[in-house]
Amino acid sequence: MEQLRLEPISRVNGSVTLPGSKSLSNRILLLAALANGTTVVENLLDSDDIRHMLGALQLLGVNVSLNQERTVATVQGVGGVFKTPREPLFLGNAGTAYRPLTAVLAAVAGEYELIGEPRMEERPIGHLVDALQALGGDITYSKNKDYPPLKIIGGQINGGEVAIDGSISSQFLTALLMAAPLFNGDTKITIKGTLVSKPYIDITLDVMARFGIEVEHSNYATFTVKGGQQYQSLERIMVEGDASSASYFVAAAAIAGGEIEIKGVGAKSVQGDIGFAKVMEQVGAKIDWYDERLVVRKGQLNGVDIDANAIPDAAMTLATVALFAKGPTAIRNIYNWRVKETDRLHAMATELRKVGAEVVEGHDFIEITPPKHFNDVAIDTYDDHRIAMCFAMVAVGGKPITINDPKCTYKTFPTFFNVLASVSE
């Protein structure tokens, strides 16, 4: 297994330009493919999850050309008419590709099979499939009920009224919303339970609106989408920088001192994970806000007790910031960490204890008391990009650390360790 040794970093200084947002990149690619006309997508993220979406779209007959850096894509939309692929669509462990494609392919004519990595077969999709079947969708499980892989015969959905559980993953609702304009009739979606990660739904609604589709909702409890609609291409669309990726550099400046300018997200960001910067201000970081950039400096860091339901991905970074804060930190309402790339709640608790922290792992919360003494250990990353990037913060705090399987960061931020080195002193 490959390992990366990170020596202590005394301070950070410089400027970071963020890669494009994963959440936005895959939503935009899919809607550009479904649209009538050609869309140029700029600042596209080049990562494993995006490559899985691009590979699937090309098998579905969508013509996509990329620049040499793979950050600008020219997508020739097919107007909602895909060809039946000759082979299964392999989507790795990319939930932002697998879930929306499940719903969209159920809505358009053709026969499709969606497969993925072993971890994808452990990530639940039953709530989405139940909703699509209730609307007339023809979807069968190839192995285990409620989990991928799936076989789909598309074009059977007429619309109607359906309820979907919002408490596990917002990606189920995102998938339904993106597919609903393609259904033959109008659709009313009612949310059961508490909707998690609500800001990710705002991203979905924002992107749909830019491609010409309006969704009515009553305070996120019900959503109404007219059927028989067509997405309209945009000449050009810019992918905002990834706010989840920004969290590591906000944290680095807050922990180590120095000053980091983060370009690509700011006060005008549409991503919920920008809320991490507001949490870090509560912790003690000093942040200057501009429309499309942040400037972050160190402050006296104190433990906090927060509900992180709106920022689940970025909140992981807070768990390693907690190692360097004064007093304990509690991160609550994060059950959906358990159904991500790995069971992140258990994984983070395990690795934080290795470093020397006292940790309480609850059903949907984690409490962290900083170490009295830091252990020089190798961090297992569980094939989870965010765990690798989070624990790099230990080195930023002036303690040596080893990261196992550092290339797992290729899922969202292939150049992460190089970028961190470029601002480290």
Swiss-Prot record:
* PROSITE patterns listed in its UniProt record: EPSP_SYNTHASE_1, EPSP_SYNTHASE_2
Lineage, top ranks: Bacteria, Pseudomonadati, Pseudomonadota, Gammaproteobacteria, Alteromonadales
Instruction: Say what the protein does.
Output: Catalyzes the transfer of the enolpyruvyl moiety of phosphoenolpyruvate (PEP) to the 5-hydroxyl of shikimate-3-phosphate (S3P) to produce enolpyruvyl shikimate-3-phosphate and inorganic phosphate.
Residues annotated for 3-phosphoshikimate binding in this entry:
K22, S23, R27, S169, S170, Q171, S197, D313, N336, K340
Tell me the route in metabolism or biology where this protein functions.
Metabolic intermediate biosynthesis; chorismate biosynthesis; chorismate from D-erythrose 4-phosphate and phosphoenolpyruvate: step 6/7
- Report which superkingdom the organism of origin falls in: Bacteria
Q: Which Pfam families match?
A: EPSP_synthase
Q: Which UniProt keywords apply?
A: Amino-acid biosynthesis, Aromatic amino acid biosynthesis, Cytoplasm, Transferase
Primary site of residence: cytoplasm
Q: Which residues bind phosphoenolpyruvate?
A: K22, G95, R123, Q171, R344, R386, K411
The answer, when asked if Transferase is one of the entry's keywords, is yes
- Gene source species: Pseudoalteromonas translucida (strain TAC 125)
Protein name per its UniProtKB record? 3-phosphoshikimate 1-carboxyvinyltransferase
